[in-house]
Structures are given as structure tokens and as C-alpha cells.
Amino acid sequence: MALNISSVFSNLFAGFSSDFKKKNFSLYGQWIGLLTIFLCIALGIANIFHASVVIVFSIICIVQGLVVVFVEIPFLLKICPLTDKFTTFIRNFDENWPRCGFYILMGAIQWLSLTVQVTSLIVVAVFFTLAGICYALAAFMHQEYLKTSFNVAGEPDSLEGQVGDHIVRNVL
């Protein structure tokens, strides 16, 4: 297999470190958003077993995680069969200010879950708020909206990168 686990992690961490060297808050917001996807799904499922209104916030959290997947990984908009209305809605978040508002709104929804009962959904609320703050700082500092530069398949000029690009081309 051309792509093994060690090369994937090596490429992931190389992209992660190169993104943080750029000192652009939109990249920080994107990485926090990617982490929030996993937190939303995991903590949403973990809190769904409460016998109170927290169940509603757990379901909302899972849905938020799935929406953030499409916001932060726009490649999925091309390969997943989605309605044009949803795709257009997600494409509205391609700048710092819209993403700031999106994450602050998502965080506010999860902060509201604390009015019912304090649960681990507070972690999701904190991370949504942090992502919103990062995008707000990027907008205030007039930083260009950047997307992460990591490539799991490797550099395009390497053999692994060419194999990865070929696989993606065949999928599309």
C-alpha cells in the first residue's frame, strides 16, 4: 500500500506545524473546528443517555458536528450527494466573519444546555467559542482567510503524493 499509517501521521503533523508557523488565526480556528467535530460527535453520543432535556442538546450537538464537517472539509461537498440549498448554505462560510458568527452561534446553543444541566457539553461550547474567537481575531487583524495546508498523501512531487492525487481524481 502506498499510503501507510506512519506516512499519514508524518504528513499530518508536518502540515500542522507549518500551519502554526504562519501565525494566522483563521488556521487556528480551522484546527479547533476540526477538533470540535470529534468532540461534538463523541460528547453528543455520551450525553444522549441522560433522562432529561439534555437529550435534545445532545442531538443538536451531533448535528452540529456533522454540519461542521462540511464547513471545515469543503472537499466533502463535492463527493457527497447533497442538496444545492445545503451546499450553497455551507459555501457562505468561506470568510472569517461568517465563520466567526457561525461558531459563536453554535457555541451559544451549547452554552444554553447549561441552563438545563451542567454536562460535558460545556467542552463543546468552549471549543466552539474558541474557534469563533480565532476567526474574529483573524477578521479584526485583517488576516487573509486561509485553509490548512496539510495533505495526508504527502507532497505533490513525491511518489506518495502522486498516488494520493490519483486516488482522489478517481473518486471525483
From Swiss-Prot:
The chain crosses the membrane at residues 31-51, 53-73, 97-114, 120-140. The keyword Transmembrane applies. This is Golgi apparatus membrane protein TVP18. One of its GO terms (cellular component) is Golgi membrane. Keywords: Glycoprotein, Golgi apparatus, Membrane, Transmembrane, Transmembrane helix. It is found in: Golgi apparatus membrane. The gene is TVP18. InterPro entries: TVP18/Ca-channel_flower (IPR019365). Golgi membrane protein involved in vesicular trafficking. It is a multi-pass membrane protein. GO terms for biological process: vesicle-mediated transport. Glycans are attached at residues 4, 24. It holds the Pfam family Cg6151-P. It comes from Debaryomyces hansenii (strain ATCC 36239 / CBS 767 / BCRC 21394 / JCM 1990 / NBRC 0083 / IGC 2968). Belongs to the TVP18 family.
